[in-house]
Amino acid sequence: MNIEKVIAREVLDSRGNPTVEAEVHLDSGFSGRAIVPSGASTGSHEALELRDGGERYMGKGVERAVQNVREALGPALIGMDASEQAAIDKALMDVDGTSNKGNMGGNAILAVSLATARAAAAELDIPLYRYLGGSNAKTLPVPMMNVINGGAHADNSVDFQEFMVMPVGAPSFREALRYGAETFHHLKKVLSGRGYNTNVGDEGGFAPDLKSNEEALEVLLEAIQQAGYEPGKDICIALDPAVTELYKDGQYHLESEGRVLSSDEMIDFWADWTSRYPIVSIEDGLAEDDWDGWERLTAKVGAKTQLVGDDLFVTNPERLQQGIDRKVGNAILVKVNQIGSLTESMDAIELAKRHHYGTIISHRSGESEDAFIADLAVATNAGQIKTGSASRSDRIAKYNQLLRIEDQLGDRAVFPGRKALR
């Protein structure tokens, strides 16, 4: 299954911003296509996302990245075996020649990397999840559904970026999705009843102008109960406060509440919330380079709460290993465009599993109809997925693909529920 041709084009993501789409064509006539996502809150240690600058698309065009695929990355792969994913990704990175993919762009490299995997699966006539994960790929992920948006994902007064529901008590993925969707619809009624708007943010969650961060928890608990579910049993809460965005001059600025907290005060803040609410997971609870604070946070609440590194680990095996060595966090968020290739993403997942860290496959705030991460979640038996709320077709595309996979697996499908949590 040798690569015959690589095509790239500029397309739009769910926010109307340009992104890269690549197609890999094989000499057998089969092909694969992939669109890369883009984040709003990005860690400083992520692979470089190459943008054009200038006036076109307000500087966010990706014609340079597309040109790099056409003129450098694609030609380097001609004649290579598409089933040799590690060799493909190494060839792409060799063309780039930097540690952060700064020459070709992580968005250019990733588009080709993912499209190659799809092309190989197409030629073998097997589902993508089976191609990537083999016969043992059978675990459907528990969804983390982002139903209240704040921070960089919304234009409102809520400091924290994501308030999510996790239907850990559901018996299957299909039922978990129903639990979450019903809660989402009841949340709309709760917010309307309190006089709040029900506009949605980048990831499909509501973005009300709440009085405080804690009110987000209150309305969420009310919605869970109105939907007929028991908080802490049927549905738990997961948070992504993304506090790197709030970290300035060594302190955490909660602007909506007029508070400035030290690392220790931020740790106490999370300890208090986890003691009073059914919060089972906190992502980026401290800033990406506050390693000492992360050690103390993990020691204080890590035994009972999943502590997820996103900006902290940026899907990078080297940063994850540093976290493992320092006993920092206990789970990793996996965003393929943070590291910029499929092979490196799967290396990070393997390293996490080897050291008993939880794994959560994640979308970005700028998404598309591409549902690659749904297959990746099942392929790696990750157990958890973050791909937005129960609205916006760019988010629903992933959920619908998981429903299809669950149907294909039939009785072999496993839904871990609460066991998915670290």
Curated annotation (Swiss-Prot):
GO terms for biological process: glycolytic process. SUPFAM superfamilies: Enolase C-terminal domain-like, Enolase N-terminal domain-like. It catalyses: (2R)-2-phosphoglycerate = phosphoenolpyruvate + H2O. Its EC number is 4.2.1.11. GO terms for cellular component: cell surface; extracellular region; phosphopyruvate hydratase complex. Its cofactor is Mg(2+). The active site is at 203 (proton donor), 335 (proton acceptor). InterPro entries: Enolase, Enolase-like_C_sf, Enolase-like_N, Enolase_C, Enolase_CS, Enolase_N. It is found in: Cytoplasm; Secreted; Cell surface. Keywords: Cytoplasm, Glycolysis, Lyase, Magnesium, Metal-binding, Secreted. Binds a second Mg(2+) ion via substrate during catalysis. (2R)-2-phosphoglycerate binds at residues 161, 335, 364-365, 386. One of its GO terms (molecular function) is magnesium ion binding. Pfam families: Enolase_C, Enolase_N. Mg(2+) binds at residues 240, 283, 310. Gene3D superfamilies: Enolase-like C-terminal domain, Enolase-like, N-terminal domain. Pathway: Carbohydrate degradation; glycolysis; pyruvate from D-glyceraldehyde 3-phosphate: step 4/5. Belongs to the enolase family. Catalyzes the reversible conversion of 2-phosphoglycerate (2-PG) into phosphoenolpyruvate (PEP). It is essential for the degradation of carbohydrates via glycolysis. This is Enolase. It comes from Deinococcus radiodurans (strain ATCC 13939 / DSM 20539 / JCM 16871 / CCUG 27074 / LMG 4051 / NBRC 15346 / NCIMB 9279 / VKM B-1422 / R1).
